[in-house]
Amino acid sequence: MEPIEQQLTELRTTLRHHEYLYHVMDAPEIPDAEYDRLMRELRELEAQRPDLITPDSPTQRVGAAPLTAFNQIRHEVPMLSLDNVFDEESFLAFNKRVQDRLKSTENVIWCCELKLDGLAVSILYENGVLVSAATRGDGTTGEDITSNVRTIRAIPLKLHGDNIPARLEVRGEVFLPQAGFEKINEDARRTGGKVFANPRNAAAGSLRQLDPRITAKRPLTFFCYGVGILEGGELPDTHLGRLLQFKAWGLPVSDRVTLCDSPQAVLDFYRNVEKDRPTLGFDIDGVVIKVNSLALQEQLGFVARAPRWAVAFKFPAQEQMTFVRDVEFQVGRTGAITPVARLEPVQVAGVLVSNATLHNADEIERLGLRIGDKVVIRRAGDVIPQVVNVVLSERPEETRPIVFPTHCPVCGSDVERVEGEAVTRCTGGLICGAQRKESLKHFVSRRAMDVDGMGDKIIDQLVEREYVHTPADLFRLTAGKLTGLDRMGPKSAQNVVNALEKAKATTFARFLYALGIREVGEATAAGLAAYFGTLEALQAATIDELQKVPDVGIVVATHVFNFFAEESNRDVIGQLLAEGVHWPAPVVINVQEIDSPFAGKTVVLTGSLSQMSRDDAKARLVALGAKVAGSVSKKTDLVIAGEAAGSKLAKAQELGITVIDEAEMIRLLDA
């Protein structure tokens, strides 16, 4: 090794060591000036020998040339969100649900952490070297922010220590400390730049810069809180153990992590953090509470898009006072008419609020609200502004009552309020432009029919120009007709037509969800599809039969029954099928009468499938008598591993469960 190579290696090792002490251990050994001197020395040596620069060198954080757009990264393991609770009663109910599902009367050991108010990211290390990073995005696909993440000094470009997995994807939060936020805004005011409303917006704006050199100038930091992909290595079997292992490898972890052995201990942690919140130096909006045992997490599983073993306990939202200048009425997808207060703009929790939901007529009556009133505004969950109460002692003389419409403000149809419901609805159905727009936007959305490129503005124009009345009309659109829309050229129009054609191939569950039946979300649609198997069987089902589907009660069953009883709905479904919308047909077989390797088996899918979608695979497996589970356990009979299979594959191998690949699955399906 040349002398300069030895110098470079020693300098990089020294700098990484001090980065670890500063960002992870919070115990710097040297002044910032000494760190800067070492960095300058490294830069000078690398300038002499650029052929010896390595990708994981501390100098390589500054970033490359600006990007023109962000590429997309598909999360191999979805980045799920958490359910929220906002008070002690709700948390205790969550705790009881967990105990009931575990069939245990013993206290659960909870791992409690801060809920950081930043931007969720995933970072992939291969053999300990940072290779990619992405935003959460929609949970399935995020933006490639690798170049920007490399500029954040708290994030190691190379992990250190022993037993580092071959592939390790860590999840965490990028955020901006309060001091850094104030400095950014101070500089912006001085130079005439953009002033951010709050640290979270500043962090998101900094991380999503197309020019990494701008990101490098922002004092972003990072805390790690979870794992996605894990291949070629092992992690401890508790959440806290994993956090400690991450810290040992050089990843920053919050020091406010506590194990709690009772619900009361969790509440004490929550109250202590809430008390300390103003002095933390960075924004949080609650605490995150997770079952510490990975085995129990696996046993609890997931519901829809959130784990059953974790919850975010949010702090009470910040409140401000302002005036209601007017009330307008919006019409939603199902005809629900929602009153919205137009406010004198006011800053609430760092965000300028000018509108607030009033929910329904009962809420207006409860508040005793009049137009012109002074009100208290809260951001519920720090997201949706709402009116908390009227400041009656300061009611102006000139206020006027809020009159709920007797006719739809959009189409003029009669409105009705069903006895026992709080919501007033427009009776116009799809003749109502507002309902038509919202229904069509739902129909083409990513988790429904997934029509790429069919955005809200296109739907608005299609409805306003009377080109489209029902979802079936979408599939009759031509490139020529679309070209006439604003900002829609021939190429874009053809892309939309192609996307519509592609969307015709769907799944029964997606199709049901896309129809927009009241109270039928993704999970319920999947349950209905799996239980009945065919559209014909579902349409013929009685209310009693519908209630046999897991998680379907009398209310949902009635909505589903009424939807299919409506002739106009059946007509639209018929038109959609006539236009070529289709999904894999289930083969209804008596499990006891067939010789299928899947019959009666509990099967788990993991990794990415290339020959068919995961939904298609599930549908075909279920049709052959399999039960498709979401996690691997001792009860699992078979694991089907696609590309980039992760922890489920490792778990299956550990338990000695039979594993086959996608090609073998297809061979067996077609046998």
Swiss-Prot record:
Presence of keyword DNA repair: yes
Single Gene Ontology BP annotation: DNA replication
Alphabetized UniProt keyword annotations: DNA damage, DNA repair, DNA replication, Ligase, Magnesium, Manganese, Metal-binding, NAD, Zinc
Pfam families xrefs: BRCT (PF00533), DNA_ligase_aden (PF01653), DNA_ligase_OB (PF03120), DNA_ligase_ZBD (PF03119), HHH_2 (PF12826), HHH_5 (PF14520), Nlig-Ia (PF22745)
EC code(s) of this entry: 6.5.1.2
SMART domains, sorted: BRCT (SM00292), HhH1 (SM00278), LIGANc (SM00532)
Reactions this protein catalyses: NAD(+) + (deoxyribonucleotide)n-3'-hydroxyl + 5'-phospho-(deoxyribonucleotide)m = (deoxyribonucleotide)n+m + AMP + beta-nicotinamide D-nucleotide
Enzyme class: ligase
Cofactor: Mg(2+); Mn(2+)
Residues binding NAD(+), per UniProt: D32, A33, E34, Y35, D36, S81, L82, E113, R136, E173, K290, K314
GO molecular function terms attached to this record: DNA binding; DNA ligase (NAD+) activity; metal ion binding
Domain BRCT: 593-671
Catalytic residues as annotated in Swiss-Prot or TrEMBL: K115 (n6-amp-lysine intermediate)
SUPFAM superfamilies: BRCT domain, DNA ligase/mRNA capping enzyme, catalytic domain, Nucleic acid-binding proteins, RuvA domain 2-like
Residues that hold Zn(2+) according to the record: C408, C411, C426, C432
Any one Gene Ontology cellular component term annotated for this protein: cytosol
Family assignment from sequence similarity: Belongs to the NAD-dependent DNA ligase family. LigA subfamily.
Job description of the protein: DNA ligase that catalyzes the formation of phosphodiester linkages between 5'-phosphoryl and 3'-hydroxyl groups in double-stranded DNA using NAD as a coenzyme and as the energy source for the reaction. It is essential for DNA replication and repair of damaged DNA.
Database matches in NCBIfam families: dnlj, PRK07956.1
Protein name: DNA ligase
Species per Swiss-Prot/TrEMBL record: Salmonella agona (strain SL483)
Name of encoding gene: ligA
